[in-house]
């Protein structure tokens, strides 16, 4: 354990997640958080007087070469199966979440903690044979901000897809309502069909699993948790879709990195560009999100 920054407002320490992996532990008067340097992956964020916002599986494998289940994995430079990988030999969601990121800067101030991370690579895959650099600026305070900047360092244009794959902690999926989703058309990955905007069958229909949908919207989304009496608002910049996912009991039981009944503790709402987007040679693009939590019950009861 080593203290990287410490002042009157808070501190940031670097600790071991396992023999293989390291993480940053953030402590501040407004918030607590944890970030894995493997994958540049946010693992937790808990504003003061609130419950944990992000879900992390107790069975997550903190090992090189294995994805961490929970927090905000980075899906990049493709989402799901690469369109040119018919046999899925390269796996889902690209290679960014399996790389070791470096800490470029940490700023601990009165409002919160800002962490800047980066990773750079070249010819990481036959499906993506380009030089590239990724940077993240993460702000943890009473709200959370994430800005991912993608730079094409090669001499050729490239195409990317990606998502900020947020696992949101909820009292139960059936208690999570996202009414804005009813206004958007979507592709249902379970049925293989596309649907026009579809009114909710019941007020709590959104979170009932299994669900795997790509909603064609970049509107602000608000997750209302009726039991925990809080809202989680997500705003996004430079994305075209929201991906809504929960595996449900049957699939989760066959996923070793989801602890028993873990699927009953989260929903995924992912700011995404699921289709390939142009990233010109020598140019940069960004994807970003802001998450805000608001309770609508007395503070004395918020951690009950």
Show which residues each predicted segment covers.
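Active-site/ligand-binding surface loops and adjacent short beta/alpha elements
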Residues: 157-159, 167-241
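Hydrophobic core residues within well-ordered beta-strands of beta-rich domains
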Residues: 134, 144-146, 285
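Short, hydrophobic/aromatic beta-strand segments
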Residues: 44-46, 156-163
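Acidic/His-leaning functional-site neighborhoods
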Residues: 98-99, 106, 204-277, 281
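Beta-strand/loop-rich accessory regions of lumenal/periplasmic or secreted enzymes
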Residues: 66-94, 182-192, 221
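Beta-strand-rich N-terminal accessory domains
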Residues: 1-69, 219-239, 283-300
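Extended, loop-rich substrate-binding clefts of extracytoplasmic carbohydrate-active enzymes
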Residues: 3, 13-14, 90-140
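Asparagine-centered strand-capping/turn motif at beta-strand->loop junctions
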Residues: 149-154, 293
């Amino acid at each position: 354990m080593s203290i990287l920054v410490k002042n009157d407002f808070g501190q940031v320490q670097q600790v071991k997640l396992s023999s293989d992996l390291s993480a940053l532990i953030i402590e501040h008067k407004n918030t607590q958080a944890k970030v894995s340097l493997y994958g540049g992956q946010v693992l937790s964020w808990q504003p003061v007087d609130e419950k944990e916002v992000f879900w992390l599986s107790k069975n997550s494998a903190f090992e090189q070469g294995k994805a961490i289940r929970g927090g905000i994995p980075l899906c990049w430079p493709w989402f799901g199966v690469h369109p040119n990988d018919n046999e899925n030999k390269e796996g889902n969601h690209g290679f960014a979440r399996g790389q070791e990121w470096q800490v470029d800067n940490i700023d601990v101030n009165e409002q919160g903690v800002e962490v800047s991370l980066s990773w750079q690579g070249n010819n990481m895959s036959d499906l993506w044979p380009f030089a590239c650099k990724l940077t993240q600026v993460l702000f943890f305070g009473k709200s959370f901000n994430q800005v991912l900047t993608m730079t094409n360092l090669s001499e050729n244009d490239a195409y990317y897809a990606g998502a900020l794959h947020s696992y949101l902690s909820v009292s139960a999926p059936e208690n999570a309502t996202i009414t804005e989703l009813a206004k958007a058309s979507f592709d249902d990955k379970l049925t293989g069909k596309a649907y026009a905007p579809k009114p909710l069958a019941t007020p709590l229909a959104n979170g009932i699993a299994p669900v795997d949908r790509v909603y064609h919207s970049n509107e602000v989304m608000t997750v209302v948790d009726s039991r925990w009496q809080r809202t989680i608002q997500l705003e996004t910049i430079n994305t075209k879709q929201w991906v809504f996912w929960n595996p449900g009991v049957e699939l989760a039981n066959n996923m070793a990195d989801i602890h028993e009944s873990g699927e009953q503790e989260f929903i995924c709402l992912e700011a995404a560009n699921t289709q390939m987007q142009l990233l010109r040679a020598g140019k940069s693009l960004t994807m970003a999100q802001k998450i805000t939590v608001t309770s609508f019950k007395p503070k004395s009861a918020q951690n009950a």
